[in-house]
Amino acid sequence: MARIATESRTTGETKIQVTLNLDGSGKAQVDTGVGFLDHMLDQIARHGGMDLEIEACGDQHIDDHHTVEDVGITMGQAFRQAIGDRRGITRFGHAYVPLDEALSRVVVDLSNRPSLSWRVKFPTQKVGNFDTELFKEWFAAFAQQGGITMHVESLYGENSHHIAESCFKALARALRSACAVDATLGGVAPSTKGTLSD
């Protein structure tokens, strides 16, 4: 069964469409109008082994907040649809990813009990024109809508770009592990409850 989903979101602030294939080859076509976010989402596709298409436009004459958050929301909704009832998946995943002097760790549980633990500090308020406080907004929106328990931690780092990119790459690798099908489960949900869809 193909694990592919398309979701869209239209509000007075943004218009977004996301297509996500969990079993892709790492291809990305992303145009959010926010250059650094595009760069980070390309990392999700490339290192997560997913195919990702995103078209977004938002009220960036105000700032990038609505676009960043709503892309996270819509991508999370697409992830939830693509992963389906979560039967037979590995469920848990973690990754440590370095980028030069920075090292980050991400741990995920595809539990359908969304939450975000965020322990990331940036030494600067911006990466280029991108507000670093918006990284947490994207991760929170994606985790909430995707039904993911997520722990994101920057263990150390000095460069804000490197810290952010190592977090996104670590998320990609953690999701890749958690989404993998575990043949030993025989299609059963990896939970003593017998389900992860409720």
Swiss-Prot record:
GO BP terms: L-histidine biosynthetic process
Alphabetical UniProt keywords: Amino-acid biosynthesis, Cytoplasm, Histidine biosynthesis, Lyase
Subcellular location: Cytoplasm
Enzyme class: lyase
GO molecular function list: imidazoleglycerol-phosphate dehydratase activity
InterPro entries, A to Z: IGPD_sf, ImidazoleglycerolP_deHydtase, ImidazoleglycerP_deHydtase_CS, Ribosomal_Su5_D2-typ_SF
Pathway: Amino-acid biosynthesis; L-histidine biosynthesis; L-histidine from 5-phospho-alpha-D-ribose 1-diphosphate: step 6/9
Catalytic reactions on record: D-erythro-1-(imidazol-4-yl)glycerol 3-phosphate = 3-(imidazol-4-yl)-2-oxopropyl phosphate + H2O
Enzyme Commission number, as recorded: 4.2.1.19
Record Pfam families: IGPD
GO CC aspect terms: cytoplasm
Similarity-based family: Belongs to the imidazoleglycerol-phosphate dehydratase family.
HAMAP family: HisB (MF_00076)
PANTHER family, A to Z: IMIDAZOLEGLYCEROL-PHOSPHATE DEHYDRATASE, IMIDAZOLEGLYCEROL-PHOSPHATE DEHYDRATASE HIS7
Protein name, as recorded: Imidazoleglycerol-phosphate dehydratase
Organism of this sequence: Magnetococcus marinus (strain ATCC BAA-1437 / JCM 17883 / MC-1)
